[in-house]
Amino acid sequence: MLQPNFRRFEPSYSWKSREKSTENRGFLSRMCGIKQKMNKYNCRGKYQETNDQNLMQDSGYSLKIISSGDEQITIVYTSRLGKMKDLQVPEIEISGVLLERLEACNYRLDELFIDLKASKCICSSNELLNIPKIIVRRLFLKMESLEMLEWWIERVDPNSLNELCIAPHGEYPLDIPSKIFDLPHFQNCKTLSIMEHCSFSTDQFLALCIAIPNFSFYSDRIDENIVAHAIKKRLSLNDQFVVLEWFFTKHVNVEKVTGDLKCTNYDRKERFDVKTECFEPVDVYSVPDENNKKTSLLVLKDSTDNFKPYNIVAFS
């Protein structure tokens, strides 16, 4: 676990003043029109969902597993017929109840949302050890331990994933080692948001940048030159570049990222009205490629002045 000088992040932009907003919309959503979802147990910030004509047909099932204190776990199960009554289950009984729910939906889910404290009851369960791979479109994990994080990822069919979001469970992020990024789940999804600290290798990072249309990550291991190279790689591809977002707490030389990319003549209001955004100040650069396809590069700064800058976003 990272020490207190590191900051906990939520993906996709907290409001400076939520009570003044009448909409549950986040920063990039308002600029790019990316669809968002909010719900009672949302711990993933405001994740981004892209449209894909080839996505697996909706199963109509969702499952949420949430630590609720006093060694109890809440299970929220929704089927085609609507939401069932929430279950409060003792931690030691969770394996049997979970197996029953998975069998009821034939191991096919639209959404699997898991927010759990460290526990051996699931990871060491013989009942769950050899279950079929869970076919799920959207997987959201908020785990207290790396062991549980890896265990749950490996229970999921990597070929079915459209979105994967990993959020910190406690006050400070875990440090995800490079070996976890070798799992195929990270390469196959369309949207990947990791707000635990990513200690991937340069090669792993570049591979993710090329493979994933919407990629948000927190890392102080990746340097400015590598991020600049990743943006150039994405711009050189023929497919639609969507979002690459880098959160960090270390000092970053923004010019190393933007120097070869930004245009001298750019219009701050070309894509949105700066005055309505969440963070101040915001630097915006318009980056056309050789085919004149426009991409925007944002540098966001924390309004509390604790971190300058806060993150860098490239999107089209």
Swiss-Prot record:
InterPro entries to which the protein is assigned, alphabetical: She-1-like (IPR042317)
Annotated protein name in UniProt: Uncharacterized protein K06H7.1
Organism: Caenorhabditis elegans
